[in-house]
């Protein structure tokens, strides 16, 4: 009987151990289930108010009451609409927890939202470089593409049976989304580079530095956009990364738009001096700008050589805001002829040539007046700002003005 009692005791102990293990496993699963939505909800709780603020601010904040800011306002409002669409997406996730209730519906909503927002984001950015970019044809094209994409996504998610075919179709749609985003981003980059070329050929000041954020944001948007597309299909416990990563991304966008407002008028005036019609703009122009070849200009520059030399002697290049149009009027010549002369003679763009003259002027001042401060030196040499002067000086000389002064005056 004692042996039988020992057997019963062992069975009871084993049963209790199994129950304890099951309880621990169940408890751990409950913790996991509880923790994932809480982190996910916290990330949405953090991002959603910011998104709503950015969206409504972009839509309704005032700009200076000048006609020239009309295009900036339209661009910012389009960006505001995109931000509010994303906010609506976040709200559905936050208040209804759709990802945990119906994953297919969440994927459809995310992909459809991203597709539409890609169009809005690219349109808003390119508008800052090309006021004629948005046309009825382009708007309808993007709307039709969005409807087709959303419809196909719905068919794949809700009508196709789960399996290899559905996964392959989802992968194809994800590739379409990414390619669409990359194509739009490429348009922004082409527009940006075209604008930089225009500024370098026509402006003495480094106007391009004011639109550099467009290039930075676009490359960031490509990485972020592709990441969002991939994170849509990741396990639930990693989704909060997608939400939290949006905070610095959209914060940078907000800061850039606010900062650009300070320089927009100067940039737009630079555009207006050289772009007069829709044909000259950079909308769909994906080729290099037409450059005057040496064969198309007179072989001899005898007439202009003396004029340019005399103008350099007067230190006319230190004038801030100087343009090739103004210089051509001073020298009584035309812009095409002057631009070709600069490229052929100095192997530089107009801006690079003027910058080199200003830097030589600054170095001469440093030699004669080593006590001068950098801010005054930058202004007297014709540079827009102290930082712009230091950047240009360092790029050419390989050291800062302060180090150059010590090395050359000791």
Residues covered by each model-derived region:
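Short, small-residue-biased leader/transition segments that mark boundaries at the very start
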Residues: 1-8
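N-terminal low-complexity or simple alpha-helical regulatory segments
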Residues: 27, 31-151, 168-172
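Alpha-helical transmembrane segments in multipass membrane proteins, preferentially the mid-helix core
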Residues: 56-59, 120-128, 180-200, 254-256
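Juxtamembrane "helix-exit" motif on the non-cytosolic side of transmembrane helices
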Residues: 63, 91-101, 153-165, 226-235
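Alpha-helical transmembrane segments of multi-pass integral membrane proteins
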Residues: 67-88, 142-143, 168-231, 241-250
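Hydrophobic, helix-length membrane anchors
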Residues: 215-284
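Membrane-proximal linker segments that couple transmembrane helices to downstream signaling/catalytic modules
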Residues: 257-376, 381, 392-395, 402-410
């Amino acid at each position: 009987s004692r042996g039988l009692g020992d057997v019963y005791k062992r069975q009871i102990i084993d049963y209790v151990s199994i129950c304890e293990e099951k309880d621990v496993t169940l408890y751990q699963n409950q913790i996991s289930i509880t923790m994932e939505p809480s982190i996910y909800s916290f990330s949405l709780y953090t991002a959603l108010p910011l998104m709503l603020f950015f969206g409504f601010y972009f839509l309704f904040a005032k700009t200076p009451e000048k006609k020239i800011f009309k295009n900036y306002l339209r661009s910012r409002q389009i960006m505001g609409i995109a931000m509010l669409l994303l906010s609506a997406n976040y709200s559905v996730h936050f208040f209804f927890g759709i990802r945990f209730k119906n994953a297919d519906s969440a994927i459809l909503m995310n992909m459809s939202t991203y597709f539409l927002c890609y169009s809005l984001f690219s349109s808003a950015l390119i508008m800052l470089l090309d006021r004629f970019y948005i046309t009825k044809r382009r708007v309808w094209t993007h709307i039709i593409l969005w409807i087709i994409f959303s419809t196909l996504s719905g068919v794949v998610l809700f009508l196709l049976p789960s399996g290899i075919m559905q996964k392959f179709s989802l992968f194809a749609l994800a590739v379409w989304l990414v390619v669409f985003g990359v194509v739009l981003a490429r348009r922004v980059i082409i527009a940006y580079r075209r604008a930089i070329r225009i500024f370098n050929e026509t402006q003495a000041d480094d106007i391009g530095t004011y639109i550099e954020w467009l290039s930075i944001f676009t490359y960031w948007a490509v990485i972020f956009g592709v990441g969002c597309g991939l994170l849509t299909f990741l396990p639930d416990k990693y989704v909060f990364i997608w939400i939290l990563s949006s905070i610095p991304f959209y914060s940078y966008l907000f800061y850039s738009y606010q900062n650009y407002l300070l320089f927009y008028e100067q940039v737009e005036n630079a555009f207006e001096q050289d772009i007069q019609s829709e044909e000259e703009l950079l909308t769909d122009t994906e080729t290099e700008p037409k450059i005057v070849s040496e064969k198309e200009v007179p072989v001899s520059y005898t007439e202009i050589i003396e004029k340019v030399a005399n103008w350099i002697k007067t230190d006319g290049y230190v004038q801030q805001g100087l343009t090739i149009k103004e210089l051509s009027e001073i020298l009584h010549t035309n812009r095409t002829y002057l631009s070709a002369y600069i490229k052929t003679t100095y192997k530089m763009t107009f801006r690079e040539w003027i910058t080199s003259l200003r830097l030589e002027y600054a170095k001469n001042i440093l030699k004669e007046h080593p006590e001068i401060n950098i801010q005054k030196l930058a202004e007297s040499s014709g540079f827009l700002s102290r930082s712009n002067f230091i950047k240009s000086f360092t790029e050419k000389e390989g050291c800062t003005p302060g180090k150059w002064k010590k090395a050359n005056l000791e």
